[in-house]
Amino acid sequence: MAFLTEPEPRRGAALAVRPGIRRVVAANRGPMTYHGTNTYLIDAPGGLIVLDPGPDDPAHVAAVLAAAGPVARILLSHTHHDHLGAAPALRAATGAPVYAWHDPAVPEFVPDVRLRDGDVVDGWQAVFTPGHAADHLCFAGPDGVLFSADHVMSWSSSVVSPPCGVMTDYFASLRRLLARDDRLYLPGHGPPLPDPLPFVQDLLAHRQAREYAIVATLGAAPLTTKALTDSLYSQVDERLRRAAERNVLAHLLKLRDEKRAADNGEGWVVA
């Protein structure tokens, strides 16, 4: 499928995405994060919102604080550290409460305000989209804008890494977005995604094709997750091989739950 690219962003700058929304890209570039985590600054009726503080990086925190001015609220899409890490420092510096879904599996983080599906924060509605993470939220706002975070990214497909990531949930959350009519996605990494629904359809088809390939490869002789990954992702960049193996495991667990595959103790076989 076709992905989007963009030039290396200017570090520390708050660049306009659309009226009332700016983006500061953290300096955590990598094979899993593209140019870095997107931290969004949103002008809202109740004051400025910081969405996804980003990694625990003093330079990034300083850039966000310099660009933001007074902060009314901090929203968090999910509790992966490249999005959560700077939240304590931003909260301490601004006094702004942190709003997030609360996942008991991450005991070191408790938000000030626990969000549930459908909650609205100053015009932005929480849309529960587990899959990439068990506590993942998108946020839907005015004019068809959806902060899609790491559920849908324009530059790459998402990693679904068990146990926090669940492929069955990921499929369901993609279908949930297909039932909506959002017109612009703002992802957790990479450039904005206009006209997103065909892209989401392609993502779902890509994952379904990968699942069909796994089923076609399985037989009576057991195969390890690594062996399946080596077969299905033979051309993958070595830096992404671990992520590919986690995705394959997530597919296998989904197939196991559907009674289409089984782990016989030596490896995976067709059920």
Predicted regions and their residues:
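Active-site HxH/HxHxD metal-binding segment of metal-dependent hydrolases
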Residues: N28-G30, Y34-H35, P53-G123, S154
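Glycine/proline-rich low-complexity segments that form flexible loops, beta-turns, and polyproline
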Residues: M1-P7, G20, V106-F109, H132
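Metallo-beta-lactamase
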Residues: G47-V50, P55-D57, Q125-F128, A133-A213, ...
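C-terminal regulatory/interaction regions
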Residues: A2-F3, A216-A271
